[in-house]
Regions:
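Cytochrome P450
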Residues: 1-368
Length: 368
């Protein structure tokens, strides 16, 4: 992946909006219209890897993760936890999230890494509280998530995976309340109780989705404030700009840059390219969100953008379940960040970007 990914996206939208990548063995899709079409048409572009001859767990449609399923299986499994992530449900957590954010920001020292000092802790503690994860286990849960996001499979992963399997099995053995973990514990799939593997896979997905995106969003918000001092002043003066600012950050610096696993369920011609049944497709959200055909002045960060139907959280049946929670965390975080730092100026020489083409954000972020 080129260092300047946004110039690369711009070139690919111009010369090859739908291109076959010989290195990855997949079709790369870069323009908004085609990415949106794929997200909205699961009957053509499936999330089920069995269309490519791969199996999530050896049998089609029975994998532990609903992100590798299509409806009705996807809906059946997703709906187990979906009520907890509705905007009306998430709003009830506001006061608790404010407390977590306030505690973290008060401990953040001048010159300290913003990512490890705040941006990691906020979403990890929020999702852990929602799931009922003991405080003593949260660091391990985060490490587990990092291994999976980074697609690292080594002795360290094997060790932590065995530990987490045993720990999760233990937690599920006595979960019978009204919290998310208890509801998953009692969950049914095709009227059959979930297996231990399915329960663990479900929780793993919620942990990953509940921390990585928000951590990167928080860091990218700080970057956007630093790069746009005029906008920083507007946001400081008027909280009415908060939501517009967050949505523009999601568009401009999308935390998830691409989704690598869609599979053609049938032969289909996409933007003049013949896609064959079983072909794998990667959809580049970060490119779609800067498409000149969809957004006015897409390379400009505009807090007053009128038409901002970005795809940072996806679209359609697989739209990010935790999007309302991420937005609420970002809004609460933005308030506390602005109050903590009278002037936000990122030290780009000292800060470090993540080395993972799938996600966009900082591994370390320092302010002067």
């Amino acid at each position: 992946m080129p260092q300047d990914i946004f110039s690369y996206y711009r070139r690919m939208r111009s010369v090859g909006p739908v291109s076959f990548n010989r290195d990855s063995g997949a079709w790369d899709v870069f323009d908004y219209a085609d990415v949106h079409f794929i997200l909205m048409h699961n009957e053509i572009f499936s999330s089920d890897p069995s269309y490519s001859g791969r199996m999530a767990d050896g049998r089609r449609g029975t994998g532990a993760s609903f992100i590798t399923m299509d409806n009705p299986d996807h809906k059946d499994l997703r709906n187990i936890s979906a009520p907890f992530f509705l905007p009306s449900s998430i709003e009830k957590y506001s006061e608790h999230i404010e407390k977590i954010s306030s505690d973290l920001i008060s401990k953040l020292e001048p010159g300290q890494d913003f990512i490890s000092g705040y941006a990691v802790g906020l979403p990890v503690n929020v999702i852990s509280d929602l799931l009922g994860v003991p405080e003593s286990e949260r660091e391990m849960f985060k490490a587990w998530s990092d291994y999976i996001i980074g697609n690292r499979r080594d002795d360290g992963f094997d060790k932590i995976n065995r530990y987490m399997y045993a720990k999760m099995s233990e937690i599920f053995s006595h979960k019978d309340g009204d919290d998310i973990m208890s509801v998953i514990n009692r969950g049914l799939f095709h009227s059959t109780p979930l297996t231990v593997e399915q329960k663990i896979g479900y929780v793993m997905l919620l942990i990953i989705g509940g921390n990585e995106t928000t951590t990167n969003l928080l860091g990218n918000m700080v970057r956007a404030l630093s790069e746009n001092p005029g906008i920083q002043e507007l946001v400081r003066e008027d909280k009415g700009y908060y939501r517009n600012f967050i949505e523009e950050t999601l568009r401009y610096y999308s935390p998830i840059q691409f989704l690598p696993h869609r599979f053609a369920a049938q032969d289909y011609v996409l933007n003049g390219k013949q896609i064959r049944k079983g072909d794998r497709i990667s959809i580049w959200l970060g490119s779609a969100n800067r498409d000149e055909g969809q957004f006015d002045n897409p390379e400009e960060f505009m807090i007053d953008r009128r038409k901002n139907n970005h795809l940072a959280f996806g679209m359609g049946v697989h739209m990010c379940l935790g999007a309302p929670l991420a937005r609420l965390e970002a809004e609460i975080g933005l308030k506390d960040i602005l109050e903590k730092f009278p002037r936000i100026n990122v030290n780009r020489e000292k800060s470090k970007m993540l080395d993972n083409p799938m996600v966009y954000g900082f591994s370390e972020l320092y302010m002067d």
